[in-house]
């Protein structure tokens, strides 16, 4: 939720004595206001998480004044209402209450209780994801749901939202199509479908901002302004926790993706002018070259530049087709790199249609999608790198250097290289990883996971005075306090990732990470 603070808002942060209020506006499904309740906050919690499906959850106990209509409502009346919740702050010197929106919510299990004897209202609620993930609704009835290969991902997300009458949305997905049929059994939730669509490519996030569904890239915050600098934040911090969970440090990440089957294997392959010609038996009666068909072969010679493939069967010649191995951010196909397919290795390519319905060939990899990334002070190159690929039994092997002074991802001078702390492996396979269907996507995921697990020194958690309008994925300034005795730290920029506001004490815990351009492959592309 976006909020631009004023000088009055910032001055209010430093007031020692404050009274906290809650305003609960009841709305029907058409977003029409039904009633509004207001009272003094006794205690409660607002949790905001950038990594959770339900981004915002809210619980509170509020003393409601005697003149109210809350006693007229029973638990069933709250089931078909939205709650727009605001927190108000008042100080002895102020002549008004400063109100800040906490978002739009639905009541969850045992989420409404009212004690008329002491006028105490207790609420427990979640943001609108609760309507999609079966917290209160979201399951689909009837036949299984199928999203066909070739459908535009953005449009598929929008159509899925409309199954639950969600008509306010901002879907900023890359120009991509669904790479294979997605099937969902009866009883699947709308959120499960949205999640699988979102995760076809990395890295995207989904959440609700008030009643608007958002799907966009996880922000790198590179061009975002600092909402509060260290001069504002530092005096508000009560204590800091910068401890490292060393068991989570990893410097080698291996991804095992999908197993790739082939429709047609060719044992008769020739190579000339960076074109591979695949010949198939004339006796085959059901042979087809069309979208979604996969063709496999053993490479007779390594190609020295981008290459093509031609398919011959009977008197029919198909191609040559340029082989593409990925897609850039703008949705443009990227031709395969020189030397990507090695002599004597088995590979699979897949026929697909571009946006103009023309046939193209996509490089999938070997029979098993597999990639590995290693953090090293001395990455091998040339013949040494090729030997490392053989030793690791992984052709898609990448080393990240800790000695590159121009690196902006936080890996420069990392203390967690394999030379400094030994090799620490983490292997990802099965479950969602089986949906990673090309080596290129597996490498992107390996880069991301290795980057996350080798930057733990950049994470810090602080307890501080509550800032009711702070949100996750915002850039703030802060000066680290912990370290060796006498060690001085310079102010730095951090990105907020988790916020837990304690309404009873007027404090909050903020987990944040040191700011760097957010993903390694964004830097490269």
Q: What label would you give each PLM region?
A:
Residues 302-367:
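Acidic, glycine/polar-enriched metal-coordinating patches/loops
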Residues 2-3, 8, 67-168, 364-368, ...:
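Surface-exposed cap/loop segments at beta↔alpha junctions
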Residues 73-93, 290-295, 468-482:
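Short coil-to-beta transition motif at edge beta-strands of beta-rich domains
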Residues 263-319, 357-362:
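Exposed extracellular interaction/assembly regions and N-terminal maturation sites
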Residues 1-32, 195, 199, 217-265, ...:
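Acidic, small/polar-enriched beta strand-loop surface segments
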Residues 115-246, 259-260:
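Charged- and aromatic-enriched interaction segments used to assemble
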Residues 94-105, 342-344, 480-495:
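Short coil-to-beta-strand transition motifs
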Residues 48-69, 118-131, 255, 453-465, ...:
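Oligomerization/assembly interface segments of phage tail-like spikes and tubes
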